[in-house]
Amino acid sequence: MSTIRTDEHDDLRTTVRAFLARYAPAHDVRIWDESGTYPENLFREIARLGWYDVVTGDDTADETAGLLITLCEEIGRASSDLVALFNLNLSGLRDLHRWGTPEQRETYAAPVLAGAARLSIAVSEPDVGSDAASVTTRAERSADGWIVNGQKTYCEGAGLPGAVMELVARVGGGGRKRDQLAVFLVPVDHPGVEVRRMPALGRNISGIYEVFLRDVALPATALLGAPGQGWQILKERLVLERIMISSGFLGSVAAVIDLTVHYANEREQFGKALSAYQGVTLPLAEMFVRLDAARCAVRRSADRFDAGLPCEVESTMAKYLSGQLYAESSALAMQIQGAYGYVRDHALPMHHSDGIIARVVAGPPSVQLDFIARSMGLGASR
């Protein structure tokens, strides 16, 4: 395995940057974030270019993750929220490819690949977060399918037009709690489903939603995989998801550093540029070093994924490093740029609010460190 990028990755990076300059310029991204607008044309063009096709092949025999981290890092330079939407579609398409029937792929994957639909996931509940095995939303068998009742929270992108949720519900059965879960494919406009947008500090482009399910009648064909396979689907999904969102965070960190370096070189105080003061330059240099180290961690996890090797620990470490770094670098940038970085016609407010949630998505730091500790053989709590 090698963490050295190839000419193919460099060409892809150049292509993505040119694409984003046309379809997601900085001014437009700020407007989308401020107004909570979903850029439908952007994601239609992403679908047209075939970027989703990366996950519809045999991802154990190619450079699936290696290509995706390049895509996600470049998109992350524009917005980590755009990466979140990209990831939702990619992860959902991969789930459909690995677990879905031909009918499900035709019904749910084909519209996404055509840019006409979106995918989301619904796991968290008012009283259930990191402990996904404890979900209380229930799916009970009916004569011709399933009846679902429950509530989901913090579902990104679930209220977007044409969205389909991968809904995690309890189907019963014996054994451990995690063995009683299943995943259902549920269009958000299905009878009995109510979706409400939750006012949030960040992630305004994708939107964060709560979902109410009242006697939702689903056909048997809505079940993804088999009853009891929900935990396995989630576990597999989360590995590549962490790799993708980590690379997106690093793209955002790189953008924040670039903005702040430019500001420090241009802004003068007491007769000198801010970049002449070590109180400014040394913290920025440390962030740059941490960015390079975190990028190595992401690339290592991607290499292991593409080699078919276990990478749960590696992807968790990558997510821990990148999430912490995005939160801390955006806060540092706000401090250095002062009032200039606080006003809304600047990209920093978006990065700062999205950087805060970067610590939490795909597992908060405490849960990640607990998992890493147990992988070391320590008797960590849980």
Where would I find each of the regions flagged by the language model?
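Alpha-helical interface subdomain recognition
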Residues: M1-A78, W99-Q104, P111, G115, ...
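A short, charged helix-loop
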Residues: Y209-E236
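N-terminal glycine-rich flavin-associated loop
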Residues: V83-E103, G129-A132
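A short, Trp-centered hydrophobic/proline-enriched beta-strand micro-motif
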Residues: G115-V123, L167-V168
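A short core secondary-structure module
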Residues: N149-E194
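A structural signal for short hydrophobic beta-strand segments in well-ordered beta-sheet cores
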Residues: T137-E140
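Short Ser/Thr-interspersed hydrophobic loop/turn segments at strand-loop and sheet-helix junctions
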Residues: G50, L71-G76, V186-P191, R214-L218
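Flexible, small-/acidic-enriched active-site or ligand-binding loops
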Residues: S134, D189-P219
